């Protein structure tokens, strides 16, 4: 089989990753999922676009296909339809937990190289949301860059930049006004040819304006943002990959714009987002310390003496509690093990918030 050498490589295909895939020798062709529309998907192969439907075996397996997937397809001669025979291994995979109290998680997107976290420096500004997004990126395996937008609407952009910098650690940060095309184009320095980027951010953060600037036209419609509260809606409902004129692949996926994203992860990954807590935890008396009411807790001591800010501490406890709740929902044994610790965490968090309110 001849290897793709132009179209698919522009969409990020790396032949070396899949050379060992035996099905490539069975008359199948690689392609990438550009968009998913219910029972079929739009797939790009070296010869152009196809409409993909699942094979019977793949449908029976229960696997779901998402925008960004690399797949192996079997063409139907003389037809725009093709049969998706296999979903290739994902190098990164973005999920969120199912709504409500349902078990499991929803696949959102795959094979993302870079997550751009977009946050407005107006009423959209929230350091705590940045922490949540950094954790989501850590779990997905993708790299992340933070883009602080609307600096022209902020009275103290430098102070907010420094506040986010203390949270972000080594994560790159750009501060722009998306209405200034020159400033928006600075984002391109983070996007290599063939690499896939996508966005995280709440409605009204300026994602649509940035997307249109990067794509060189009004691909995504935008609604006005209310002056009173800074809110707005990104009106796209499609999930699709676009080639950037400068190289790279842009994914606009409405399923990953929400603030409440949360899914699989580990306590170790959470501590990577809160490194000061990980350091202080080394001083804890107990290895399974929940950093609440246990005696000789290094984290609580660090909060009391100012080495860890209360805001960061409460944010960590909140995310840790969510993580435990997700794990317990999906693992009955884990639920039994975590039940007592969860009660202690809730009680301690309420007490600390109450004590803080009295000061």
Curated annotation (Swiss-Prot):
Short name of one Pfam family: RsgA_GTPase
Q: Which residues bind GTP?
A: 149-152, 201-209
Cofactors = Zn(2+)
Q: Where in the cell is it found?
A: Cytoplasm
CDD domains assigned: YjeQ_EngC
Give this protein's Gene Ontology molecular function annotations. GTP binding; GTPase activity; metal ion binding; rRNA binding
Q: Where is this region: Disordered?
A: 331-359
Residues binding Zn(2+) are 284, 289, 291, 297
Q: Where in the chain are disulfide-linked cysteines found?
A: none
Q: CP-type G domain location, by residue?
A: 101-259
The Enzyme Commission number assigned here is 3.6.1.-
InterPro entries from the entry?
A: G_CP_dom, P-loop_NTPase, Ribosome_biogen_GTPase_RsgA, RsgA_GTPase_dom
Q: Which residues form the signal peptide?
A: none
Q: Name one GO biological process term.
A: ribosomal small subunit biogenesis
GO-annotated cellular components: cytoplasm
Composition bias of kind Basic residues appears in 349-359
Q: Which domain of life is it from?
A: Bacteria
Keywords linked to the UniProt accession: Cytoplasm, GTP-binding, Hydrolase, Metal-binding, Nucleotide-binding, Ribosome biogenesis, RNA-binding, rRNA-binding, Zinc
Q: How is the cofactor bound?
A: Binds 1 zinc ion per subunit.
Give the function comment from the record. Answer: One of several proteins that assist in the late maturation steps of the functional core of the 30S ribosomal subunit. Helps release RbfA from mature subunits. May play a role in the assembly of ribosomal proteins into the subunit. Circularly permuted GTPase that catalyzes slow GTP hydrolysis, GTPase activity is stimulated by the 30S ribosomal subunit.
Protein name per UniProt? Small ribosomal subunit biogenesis GTPase RsgA
- Protein's gene: rsgA
């Amino acid at each position: 089989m001849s290897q793709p050498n132009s179209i698919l490589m522009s969409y990020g295909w790396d032949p070396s990753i899949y050379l060992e895939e035996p099905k490539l020798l069975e008359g199948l062709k690689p392609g990438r999922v550009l968009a998913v529309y219910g029972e079929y998907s739009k797939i790009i192969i070296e010869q152009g676009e196809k409409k993909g439907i699942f094979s019977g075996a793949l449908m029976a397996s229960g696997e779901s296909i998402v925008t960004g997937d690399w797949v192996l397809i079997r063409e139907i001669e003389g037809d725009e339809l093709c049969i998706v025979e296999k979903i290739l291994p994902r190098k990164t995979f973005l999920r969120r937990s199912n709504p409500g109290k349902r078990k499991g998680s929803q696949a959102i997107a795959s094979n993302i190289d870079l997550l751009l976290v977009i946050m407005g420096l107006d009423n959209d500004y929230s350091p705590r949301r940045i922490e949540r997004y950094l954790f989501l990126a850590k779990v997905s395996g993708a790299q992340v860059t933070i883009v602080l937008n609307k600096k022209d609407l902020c009275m103290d952009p430098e102070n907010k930049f420094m506040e986010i910098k203390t949270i972000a650690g080594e994560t790159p940060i750009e501060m722009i006004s998306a209405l200034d095309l020159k400033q928006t184009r600075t984002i391109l320095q983070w996007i290599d040819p063939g690499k896939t980027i996508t966005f995280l951010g709440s409605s009204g953060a300026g994602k649509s304006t940035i997307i249109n600037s990067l794509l060189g036209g009004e691909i995504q419609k935008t609604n006005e943002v209310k002056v009173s509260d800074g809110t707005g809606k990104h009106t796209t409902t499609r999930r699709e990959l676009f080639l950037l004129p400068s190289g790279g692949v842009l994914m606009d996926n409405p399923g990953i714009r929400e603030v409440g994203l949360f899914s699989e992860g580990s306590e170790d990954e959470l501590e990577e987002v809160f490194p000061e807590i990980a350091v202080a935890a080394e001083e804890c008396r107990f290895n399974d310390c929940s950093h609440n009411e246990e005696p000789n807790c290094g984290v609580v001591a660090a909060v009391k003496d100012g080495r860890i800010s209360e805001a960061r501490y409460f944010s960590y406890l909140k995310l840790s509690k969510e993580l435990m709740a997700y794990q317990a929902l999906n693992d009955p044994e884990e639920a039994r093990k975590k039940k007592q610790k969860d009660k202690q965490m809730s009680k301690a968090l309420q007490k600390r918030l109450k004590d803080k309110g009295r000061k």
